[in-house]
């Protein structure tokens, strides 16, 4: 039906007769001529109709936005004064001699001339996806997956599918359950990841596996989360953590070159402890120059319990955050930031405004200055590198509260004061995570997942001091986003059972939930390691959007609903009966 795409026409096509198919993006009737911008997935080209071609001109007068049409015409070069530098096809136009209206469009529920609500965009997603910027994002996503497949094939990885209907295993979030008709009362689970299957593939001898795979998690959604998402899933045998990182870093560096024409350079490597200490985050945005600086040793003897308490507590921390140019902040802005850090458990936000450092106490403005002598103030200014016009904010509390609060404040200030270099790319690896964390109920939970191996520990040593264990895990972070994470896996049964025991999973439960894995570990399991990238998040970064729904063709809302298809929906009672399921309605208060 077509000979060319609209968006690919250029001066090399001048004089050629072409047939185009697409949609009317805009129509302009000048009386003697009718112009339309015609759009397809590759872009937009200007088409015009002349009264001398009476049939085509008459039909063109009926055109409205989003009519689906076919035109045949001749490509012409535009006069220099009419060249549109803002269009890829702006040097040419098409003189249409034939027009076919393939399908008319009713008045549109979306207005291309204004910002539509996200609810409307999701309800009429098929119209929203016609917008060039949305089409471009999905084309970029397709380019990413195509590149990944070529790279993995070239590096000896096998694309192997794993089951979508599997067994529920504890991986941190709730499972989506699928009832079995054949085995009434039993349920499959949709996979939160192919984690155990890819480990079993290594035990099967496949050595290098990858898969671009859907995963499912029934969890409370955030703006950057979806109930179903896509991973680039990778697993290898007989490779160390540094070797896995080397191959995966090569993949991402070459991907950025291919898609963006940008060389990310060699990725720095930072431990979890250093990232938390310097940036208050295990996924630091290195485009932001601000760092947290420990000052507890300077404040142990001050007569100010807010500082002295955490400074003398082994579990406490006092840290300072220097904000270049921050002295310009108003009292209201400071109060707003004080309320902001309370979200993360902080009780407030002490500060020092540095007006003229050379004047000592007389050159600063601070509500806590009365508790500090000139020597302490100068030591703080020296350690933080403060200059005239800077602001220093303080966090004083439990270590985690200080890291979370000042880490979040650092990001917010970086954005609010334009301190973060938005034009920069800042990748890194974060390694050496704690293996376990407090579960809030007196026990421990796995910081990553229960199949991650500890670093340089025997099973006996791990059992004796699990709180000291460092996971042989690694996360790839770009511009403050965790784009991928992985680890060396446990490949010995004794170690796996020890980890399960530390997590409070007794032997009976281990056999019930993971018997197949424990059995497989008895038969010559190779050392193996892997990683998974979030395809959605990679696409967000490479397309410059901060909304994950912009890079998924048919996403869900934050309430895990599809406004277009109205999923989820009530099931047919007959289908439920076949599954042995009865919907129990909540009793009203008066009937209780």
Swiss-Prot record:
Residue ranges for the region (Aspartate) are: 195-198
EC code:
6.1.1.12
- Coiled coil spans: none
One Gene Ontology cellular component annotation held by this UniProt entry = cytoplasm
Task: Please name the GO terms that the record assigns under molecular function.
Answer: aspartate-tRNA ligase activity; ATP binding; nucleic acid binding
Q: What class of enzyme is it?
A: ligase
Residues bound to L-aspartate are: 171, 217, 448, 489
Q: Where would you find this protein in the cell? A: Cytoplasm
Reactions mediated catalytically: tRNA(Asp) + L-aspartate + ATP = L-aspartyl-tRNA(Asp) + AMP + diphosphate
- Pfam families cross-referenced by the UniProt entry: GAD, tRNA-synt_2, tRNA_anti-codon
Principal location class: cytoplasm
**Entry keyword set:** Aminoacyl-tRNA synthetase, ATP-binding, Cytoplasm, Ligase, Nucleotide-binding, Protein biosynthesis
BP GO annotations:
aspartyl-tRNA aminoacylation
Function statement: Catalyzes the attachment of L-aspartate to tRNA(Asp) in a two-step reaction: L-aspartate is first activated by ATP to form Asp-AMP and then transferred to the acceptor end of tRNA(Asp).
NCBIfam families annotated for this entry?
Answer: aspS_bact (TIGR00459), PRK00476.1 (NF001750)
Complexes and interactors: Homodimer.
Put simply, this protein is called Aspartate--tRNA ligase
Q: From which organism does this entry originate?
A: Cronobacter sakazakii (strain ATCC BAA-894) (Enterobacter sakazakii)
């Amino acid at each position: 039906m077509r000979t060319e795409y609209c968006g690919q026409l250029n001066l090399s096509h001048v004089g050629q007769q072409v047939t185009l198919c697409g949609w009317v993006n805009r129509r302009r009737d000048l009386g003697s001529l009718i112009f339309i911008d015609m759009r397809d997935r590759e872009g937009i080209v200007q088409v015009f109709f002349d009264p001398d071609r009476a049939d085509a001109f008459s039909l063109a007068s009926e055109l409205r936005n989003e009519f689906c049409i076919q035109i045949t015409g001749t490509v012409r070069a535009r006069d220099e004064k009419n060249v549109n530098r803002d269009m890829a096809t702006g040097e040419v136009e098409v003189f249409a001699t034939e027009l076919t209206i393939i399908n008319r469009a009713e008045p549109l529920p979306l207005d291309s001339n204004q910002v539509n609500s996200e609810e409307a965009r999701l309800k009429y997603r098929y119209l929203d996806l016609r917008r060039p910027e949305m089409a471009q994002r999905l084309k970029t996503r397709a380019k990413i997956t195509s590149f990944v497949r070529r790279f993995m094939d070239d590096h000896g990885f096998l694309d192997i599918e794993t089951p979508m209907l599997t067994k529920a295993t504890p991986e941190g979030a709730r499972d989506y359950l699928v009832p079995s008709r054949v085995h009434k009362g039993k349920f499959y689970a949709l996979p939160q990841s192919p984690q155990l299957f890819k480990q079993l593939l290594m035990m099967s001898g496949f050595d290098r596996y990858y898969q671009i795979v859907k995963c499912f998690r029934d969890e409370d959604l955030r703006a950057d989360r979806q109930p179903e998402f896509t991973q680039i899933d990778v697993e290898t045998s007989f490779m160390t953590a540094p070797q896995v990182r080397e191959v995966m870093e090569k993949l991402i560096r070459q991907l950025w070159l291919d898609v963006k024409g940008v060389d990310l350079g060699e990725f720095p490597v930072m431990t979890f402890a250093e990232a938390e200490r310097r940036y208050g985050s295990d996924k630091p945005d290195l485009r932001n120059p601000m760092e947290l600086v420990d000052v507890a040793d300077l404040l142990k003897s001050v007569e100010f319990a807010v500082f002295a308490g955490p400074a003398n507590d082994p579990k406490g921390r006092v840290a300072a955050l220097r904000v270049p140019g921050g002295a310009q902040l108003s009292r209201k802005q400071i109060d707003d930031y004080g309320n902001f850090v309370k979200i993360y458990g902080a009780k407030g936000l002490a500060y020092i405004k540095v007006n003229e450092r050379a004047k000592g106490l007389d050159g600063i403005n601070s509500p806590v200055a009365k508790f500090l002598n000139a020597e302490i103030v100068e030591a703080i200014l020296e350690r933080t590198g403060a200059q005239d016009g800077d602001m220093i904010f303080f966090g004083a509390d439990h270590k985690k509260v200080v890291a979370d609060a000042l880490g979040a404040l650092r990001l917010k200030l970086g954005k609010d004061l334009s301190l973060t270099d938005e034009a920069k790319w800042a990748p890194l690896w974060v390694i050496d995570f704690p293996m376990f964390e407090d579960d809030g109920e007196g026990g421990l939970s796995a910081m990553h997942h229960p199949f991650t191996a500890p670093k340089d520990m025997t099973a006996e040593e791990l059992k004796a001091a699990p709180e000291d264990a460092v996971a042989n895990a690694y996360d790839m972070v770009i511009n403050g986003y965790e784009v991928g994470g992985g680890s060396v896996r446990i490949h010995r049964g004794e170690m796996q059972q020890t980890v399960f025991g530390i997590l409070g999973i007794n032997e009976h439960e281990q056999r019930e939930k993971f018997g197949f894995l424990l059995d497989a570990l008895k038969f010559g399991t190779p050392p193996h390691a892997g990683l998974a990238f979030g395809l959605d998040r990679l696409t967000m970064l490479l397309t410059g959007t901060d909304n994950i729904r912009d890079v998924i063709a048919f996403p869900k809302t934050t309430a895990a609903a599809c406004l277009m298809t109205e999923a989820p929906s009530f099931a047919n009672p007959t289908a439920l009966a076949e599954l042995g399921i009865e919907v129990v309605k909540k009793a009203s208060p008066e009937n209780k």
